């Protein structure tokens, strides 16, 4: 019985299946944790969603910013960008079922026995473990409610970018969503910077990758995240695991078997020619 952790799939269904085959993943006894961004940019978002959904309890995913954007597009709130390649998904006969399943997925996964935490972008250094769990749960509750389109309409925006327990309403939910699904850099005081997307060596001072600031999460917990493909899985301190290695950009899909820390990779496959 193994625990596998896989980076952002972005519609790269063939690479996903090839990677799981390489690792001898068995959904009847193994568990697959996914860092989010199952959809968009790659060619087969529909197949990825269908596959992960049918894994049932063998899959533990978190929502990423591209997954949230899909929810917005489907609700008629966000614009469908051709580069996301989600038209087939939007028009699928089971689109309703898939979207309703997707919006009920969490933003944070944790296992206290394995001492493992996963979110899409990371955990802001301004949060301790209980605050992270609470804030993720608040956003999840909103997405599970009938008024979730109201939040989708207010989700976009970079402010507020500083955590306070006094934050409330949509502003609090927006901060939490940004911290869990979009964050890369912080100022030294932990404030989020939502603009810089460069590699760490090119980032302007005083910005630091969120994982370089002092954390409030207990040190025995590992934090697993995706989102930041330009890291190429490198440069994080001990107990931080960056798993997005840019498969949809011609890089590779990366998976980690937790029990023995063995990595498995699958290079991006050439596009299938349409006849």
Swiss-Prot record:
Hydrolyzes diadenosine 5',5'''-P1,P4-tetraphosphate to yield ADP. GO terms for molecular function: bis(5'-nucleosyl)-tetraphosphatase (symmetrical) activity. InterPro entries: ApaH, Calcineurin-like_PHP_ApaH, Metallo-depent_PP-like. Belongs to the Ap4A hydrolase family. The keyword Flavoprotein does not apply. CDD domains: MPP_ApaH (cd07422). Keywords: Hydrolase. NCBIfam families: apaH, PRK00166.1. Pfam families: Metallophos (PF00149). Signal peptide: none annotated. The gene is apaH. This is Bis(5'-nucleosyl)-tetraphosphatase, symmetrical. HAMAP family: ApaH (MF_00199). It catalyses: P(1),P(4)-bis(5'-adenosyl) tetraphosphate + H2O = 2 ADP + 2 H(+). Its EC number is 3.6.1.41. It comes from Photorhabdus laumondii subsp. laumondii (strain DSM 15139 / CIP 105565 / TT01) (Photorhabdus luminescens subsp. laumondii). The keyword Hydrolase applies. It comes from the Bacteria. Gene3D superfamilies: 3.60.21.10.
């Amino acid at each position: 019985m193994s625990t596998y952790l896989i980076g952002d799939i972005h519609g790269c269904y063939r690479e996903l299946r090839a990677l799981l085959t390489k690792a001898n993943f068995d959904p009847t006894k193994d568990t697959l944790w996914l860092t989010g961004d199952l959809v968009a940019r790659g060619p087969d978002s529909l197949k990825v969603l269908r596959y992960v959904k049918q894994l049932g309890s063998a899959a533990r995913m978190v929502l990423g910013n591209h997954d949230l954007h899909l929810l917005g597009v489907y609700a008629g709130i966000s614009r469908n960008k051709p580069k996301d390649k989600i038209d087939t998904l939007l028009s699928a006969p089971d689109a309703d079922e898939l979207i309703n399943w997707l919006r009920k997925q969490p933003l944070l996964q944790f296992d206290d026995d394995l001492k493992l935490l996963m979110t899409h972008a990371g955990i802001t250094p301004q949060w301790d473990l209980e605050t992270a769990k609470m804030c993720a749960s608040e956003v999840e509750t909103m997405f599970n409610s009938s008024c979730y389109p109201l939040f989708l309409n207010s989700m976009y925006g970079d402010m507020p970018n500083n955590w306070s327990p006094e934050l409330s309403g949509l502003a609090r939910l927006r901060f939490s969503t940004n911290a869990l699904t979009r964050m890369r850099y912080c100022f030294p005081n932990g404030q989020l910077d939502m603009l810089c997307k460069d590699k760490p060596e090119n980032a302007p001072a005083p910005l630091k990758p969120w994982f370089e600031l002092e954390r409030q999460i207990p040190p025995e917990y590992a934090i697993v995240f995706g989102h930041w493909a330009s890291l190429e899985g490198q440069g994080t301190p001990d107990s931080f695991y960056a798993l997005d290695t840019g498969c949809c950009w011609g890089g590779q899909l990366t998976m980690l078997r937790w029990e023995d820390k063995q990595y498995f990779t699958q290079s991006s496959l050439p596009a299938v020619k349409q006849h």
